[in-house]
């Protein structure tokens, strides 16, 4: 029997007194959460943001986990000093880790442990604190904020201000829950609109005190406090564009030193609105279908399928990396598609009878009906197709992305959150049409669509990591920025010794938030939502 999710738990992470791995400055730490479902293999679930030049980081990005009462959920929090832009952690300095169960965290509510090395021995210094909160509320607060006449903290140029929001815990401590972007060189900044869950902001209590701090960002990590104010949601929600709610930004040290001190600037809340966001399960249970499409790389670099060295070689027990990826992801996602008919395409091969190179040919060779019956149908189409084509090239992604995008665009005519499209591309190597693919992804980001790329074999996948917008927004050659991150890339080699479900859990981890993010952005409700009627 499948485990029933009792509730969702939000984990907030901070560290103290970390090892200093950088010679000329302090470490730039981030926290990686790993999960263990099988007993031996750990797989990565999510990462916090990287905090520059800090040995005592407080991460604003939280981890949200389904809490299962009847399952021992093993978690590992790894702390790394990040000095480059690659996704791999092997080339970053490891500062220590902490293994713990979710049950231990929730029963403690706040757990502090010393960091240990991979061999289990103490890291020498550094501790991690994990705070747990149950998420009971899907209300979010939308903010528009600006400031004027902020103090200038910089000798050359002007301050680079950003805001931090803090809520007060039951024991009186302040916990940071949101950090805005930095506005460079500006004493009258206008921050981008942002949202914070009401639970994160004030536990859903409209009269709970909220502290807002304004800082001047410094590259060396020694951010200067410009000033602070305290308020409540009751006061904040009075704000409107015609009548903003304004707060004096007060620096207590300056006020005590200077009798004539008035303030360090004024922070203006132009808009503060509470709205309810549907959850992923609200959409799924409300009738949203996930449409799954597979794209398989049949380029020559895979090697002759009849040779055991080929990535397309099917072993005597009937598997290869392509088939494993199809099974792993497909078995999870098929439950969210009512008819279980999945289109499957190949690209980069010469196809009969003309032997022209195609980058979106149906693996069942039926252009009018490229659908396969279930995941088994995709596997059978792949096996049947392989001996009938000639592996060729180049490795072009954009045709198949644009193909699925056309269906996603048609679905937007329905005005409800009725369909979402997930494209799985399995590839062995370096992408050829990078500019066209970047443009295709930027276009697809405006549609109900996500792209999963699984890299098989041992090739250099740096271009794929570039498409996965985790390090910042992807741009089209035109300069247009993707409005959301829709690409998830993982190299298959990370999962070669993992249980079969680990790959799917990793690549599908971001899908729920991408689904919710899209439908919330366009204010689309589930088809069966009572509010629609």
Swiss-Prot record:
> What CDD domains does this protein map onto?
C2A_Copine, C2B_Copine, vWA_copine_like
Q: How is it modified after translation?
A: Phosphorylated on serine and threonine residues.
List of residues binding Ca(2+) 4: 154, 216, 218, 224
Q: Does the keyword Cytoplasm apply?
A: yes
Q: Where in the cell is it found?
A: Nucleus; Cytoplasm; Cell membrane; Cell junction
Report the Gene3D superfamilies cross-referenced here: C2 domain
Keywords of this entry: Calcium, Cell junction, Cell membrane, Cytoplasm, Membrane, Metal-binding, Nucleus, Phosphoprotein, Repeat
Superkingdom per UniProt: Eukaryota
Q: Which GO terms describe its biological process?
A: cellular response to calcium ion; cellular response to growth factor stimulus; ERBB2 signaling pathway; positive regulation of cell migration
The modified positions for Phosphoserine read: 14, 197, 243
Q: Domain named VWFA: which ranges? A: 291-513
**Gene Ontology terms, cellular component aspect?**
cell junction; cytoplasm; cytosol; focal adhesion; mitochondrion; nucleolus; nucleoplasm; nucleus
State how it assembles: Monomer. Interacts with ERBB2 (preferentially with the tyrosine phosphorylated form); this interaction occurs at the cell membrane and is increased in a growth factor heregulin-dependent manner. Interacts with SHC1; this interaction may mediate the binding of CPNE3 with ERBB2. Interacts with RACK1.
The record describes the protein's role as: Calcium-dependent phospholipid-binding protein that plays a role in ERBB2-mediated tumor cell migration in response to growth factor heregulin stimulation.
Read off the PANTHER family from this record. COPINE, COPINE-3
Q: What is this protein called?
A: Copine-3
Q: Which organism is it from?
A: Mus musculus (Mouse)
Which lineage do the record's taxonomy fields give for this organism?
Answer: Eukaryota, Metazoa, Chordata, Craniata, Vertebrata
């Amino acid at each position: 029997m499948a485990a029933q999710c009792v509730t969702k738990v939000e984990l907030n992470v901070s560290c103290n007194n970390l090892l200093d791995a950088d010679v000329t400055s302090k470490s730039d730490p981030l926290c990686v959460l790993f999960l263990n479902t099988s007993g031996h293999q750990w797989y990565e679930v999510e990462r916090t943001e990287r905090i520059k030049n800090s040995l005592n980081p407080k991460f604003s990005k939280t981890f949200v986990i389904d809490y299962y009462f009847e399952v021992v959920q093993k978690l590992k929090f790894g702390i790394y000093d990040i000095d480059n832009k690659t996704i791999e952690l092997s080339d970053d300095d490891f500062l220590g880790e902490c293994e713990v169960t979710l049950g231990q965290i929730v029963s403690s509510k706040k757990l502090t442990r010393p960091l240990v090395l991979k061999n289990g021995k103490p890291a020498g210094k550094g501790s991690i604190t994990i705070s747990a909160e149950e998420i009971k509320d899907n209300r979010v607060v939308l903010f528009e904020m600006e400031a004027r006449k902020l103090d200038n903290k910089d000798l050359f140029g002007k301050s680079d201000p950003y805001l931090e929001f803090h809520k007060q815990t039951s024991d009186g401590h302040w916990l940071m829950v949101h950090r805005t972007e930095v506005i460079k060189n500006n004493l009258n900044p206008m921050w981008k609109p942002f949202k914070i869950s009401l639970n994160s902001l004030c536990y859903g209590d409209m009269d709970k005190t909220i502290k807002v701090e304004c800082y001047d960002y410094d590259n060396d990590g020694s951010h200067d406090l410009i000033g602070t104010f305290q308020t409540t949601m009751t006061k904040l929600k009075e704000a409107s564009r015609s009548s903003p709610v304004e707060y004096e930004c007060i620096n207590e040290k300056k006020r005590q030193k200077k009798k004539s001190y008035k303030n360090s600037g004024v922070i203006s809340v132009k808009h503060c609105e509470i709205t309810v966001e549907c959850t992923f399960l609200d959409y799924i249970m409300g009738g949203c279908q996930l449409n799954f499409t597979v794209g398989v790389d049949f380029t020559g670099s895979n090697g002759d399928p009849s040779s055991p060295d080929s990535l397309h070689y099917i072993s005597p027990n009937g598997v290869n990396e392509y088939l494993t990826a199809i099974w792993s992801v497909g078995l999870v996602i098929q439950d969210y598609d009512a008819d279980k008919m999945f289109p499957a395409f190949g690209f980069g091969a010469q196809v009969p009878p003309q032997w022209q190179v195609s980058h979106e040919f149906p693996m069942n060779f039926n252009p009018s009906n490229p659908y396969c019956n279930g995941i088994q149908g995709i596997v059978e189409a792949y096996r049947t197709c392989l001996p009938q084509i000639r592996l060729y090239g180049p490795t072009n992604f954009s045709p198949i992305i644009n193909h699925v995008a056309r269906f996603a665009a048609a679905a937007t005519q329905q005005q409800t959150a009725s369909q979402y499209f997930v494209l799985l591309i399995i590839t062995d190597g370096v992408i050829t049409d990078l500019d066209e693919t970047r443009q295709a992804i930027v276009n697809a980001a405006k549609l109900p669509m996500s792209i999963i790329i699984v890299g098989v074999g041992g090739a250099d996948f740096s271009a794929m990591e570039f498409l996965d917008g985790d390090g910042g927004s992807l741009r089209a050659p035109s300069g247009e920025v993707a409005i959301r991150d829709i690409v998830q890339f993982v190299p298959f080699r990370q999962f070669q010794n993992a249980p079969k479900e680990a790959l799917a859990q990793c690549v599908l981890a971001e899908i729920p938030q991408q689904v919710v993010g899209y439908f919330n952005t366009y204010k689309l409700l589930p088809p069966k939502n009572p509010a629609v009627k």
